[in-house]
Amino acid sequence: MAKADFYETLGVAKTADEKELKSAFRKLAMKFHPDKNPDDKDAERKFKEINEAYEMLKDPQKRAAYDRYGHAAFEHGGMGGGGGGGFAGGGFSDIFEDIFGEMMGGGRARQRSSGGRERGADLRYNMEITLEEAFSGKTAQIRVPTSITCDVCSGSGAKPGTQPKNCGTCQGSGRVRAAQGFFSIERTCPTCHGRGQIIPDPCPKCHGQGRVTEERSLSVNIPAGIEDGTRIRLQGEGEAGARGGPAGDLYIFLSVKPHEFYQRDGADLYCAVPISMTTAALGGTFDVATLDGTKSRVSVPEGTQAGKQFRLKSKGMPVLRSAQTGDLYIQIQIETPQKLTKRQRELLQEFEQLSSKENNPESTGFFARMKEFFEG
């Protein structure tokens, strides 16, 4: 019987991204998990199909091979079978490695070790924090859906009281040789799929995988001064390895939300502050709230122009893993009055009549230079 399409098995489009694949897998795995469907052979079969489809599609190289060649890409053990995790087992080139490995002095090293143990997949978790949290640092609690070591078989995949056995086809090597003409060709063992072992009595909980899918709660330390786009690695917190293999790593990708008032450039902060035309002309003061919870008073001198910057030293962001702190720059914007009353308009017109070139040196000089440029 022809195998079902992996995308159809998971109920996703061929354009589905990593997040959509994982979400679909989790929903279906929960629905058809054997623990929820005891003695239901159809549910068990469906659960295995879902696992196989997800294991193939979550690996970019395997997915690319499947998209191009379909199930033919994995025939004859070309990619090591559907079990296992992470970034182990290379791409479609494994098919050619099986054919030419003997002539080229053996295949390349793999992440699958003796006894069928495989390293778990690395996981990615996207976290969004506020600028205030990036300023002060925090300890965040996150829940990560992942594969963990089965607590019934301790990751061996075998029913308690039993042990995996060496594969009789490859005698535990995970590879078999066949003579073709003048050449001796080495392939991945079709019986154990390169693991070197078989499990006659699978664990009733994980069905021989050595892992089960669950959500884990983890504590993540976000240091003060962390920047947008920073990646935090939690070693050994990724998916559990298959059949007792080492766990993968968890990578936390941080993004800092845009702030309503502040913009960040490294350790420095910038804040645009609008002031009235009269404050700019006559001078004045205003208070600015800073991220450390205090207020800083800014004095605006008489005749302040738009774009003027005032520096508040050490009021910026802390420098990551350092005692240094950036600065806060206040950028002045001058607000033009709107919806003037008749009296306000009259006063401004009177002010304009009383103004001289000395009151507006920049505009006066600009238009004079422009006139000279065009008229010569």
UniProtKB/Swiss-Prot annotation:
The record ties this protein, via SUPFAM superfamilies, to: Chaperone J-domain, DnaJ/Hsp40 cysteine-rich domain, HSP40/DnaJ peptide-binding domain
Q: Which residues bind Zn(2+) 2?
A: 167, 170, 189, 192
Span of domain J: 5-70
Q: Which cofactor is recorded for it?
A: Zn(2+)
Q: Which residues bind Zn(2+) 1?
A: 150, 153, 203, 206
Please give the Gene Ontology molecular function terms for this protein: ATP binding; heat shock protein binding; unfolded protein binding; zinc ion binding
Q: Where in the cell is it found?
A: Cytoplasm
Looking up InterPro entries in the UniProt record yields: DnaJ (IPR012724), DnaJ_C (IPR002939), DnaJ_domain (IPR001623), DnaJ_domain_CS (IPR018253), HSP40/DnaJ_pept-bd (IPR008971), HSP_DnaJ_Cys-rich_dom (IPR001305), HSP_DnaJ_Cys-rich_dom_sf (IPR036410), J_dom_sf (IPR036869)
* Keyword entries, A-Z: Chaperone, Cytoplasm, DNA replication, Metal-binding, Repeat, Stress response, Zinc, Zinc-finger
Q: Where are the zinc fingers (CR-type)?
A: 137-215
| Keyword Secreted appears in the UniProt entry | no
| Domain of life according to the entry | Bacteria
Q: What biological processes does GO assign it?
A: chaperone cofactor-dependent protein refolding; DNA replication; protein refolding; response to heat
User: What remark does the entry make about the cofactor?
Assistant: Binds 2 Zn(2+) ions per monomer.
- Chief location bin: cytoplasm
Any one Pfam family here would be DnaJ_CXXCXGXG
Q: Which GO terms describe its cellular component?
A: cytoplasm
Q: Where are the CXXCXGXG motif repeats?
A: 150-157, 167-174, 189-196, 203-210
Q: Which family does it belong to?
A: Belongs to the DnaJ family.
Its subunit composition reads: Homodimer.
* Record function comment: Participates actively in the response to hyperosmotic and heat shock by preventing the aggregation of stress-denatured proteins and by disaggregating proteins, also in an autonomous, DnaK-independent fashion. Unfolded proteins bind initially to DnaJ; upon interaction with the DnaJ-bound protein, DnaK hydrolyzes its bound ATP, resulting in the formation of a stable complex. GrpE releases ADP from DnaK; ATP binding to DnaK triggers the release of the substrate protein, thus completing the reaction cycle.
Q: What is known of its domains?
A: The J domain is necessary and sufficient to stimulate DnaK ATPase activity. Zinc center 1 plays an important role in the autonomous, DnaK-independent chaperone activity of DnaJ. Zinc center 2 is essential for interaction with DnaK and for DnaJ activity.
Q: What is this protein called?
A: Chaperone protein DnaJ
> Which species is this UniProt entry from?
Rhizobium leguminosarum bv. trifolii (strain WSM2304)
**Organism placement in taxonomy:** Bacteria, Pseudomonadati, Pseudomonadota, Alphaproteobacteria, Hyphomicrobiales
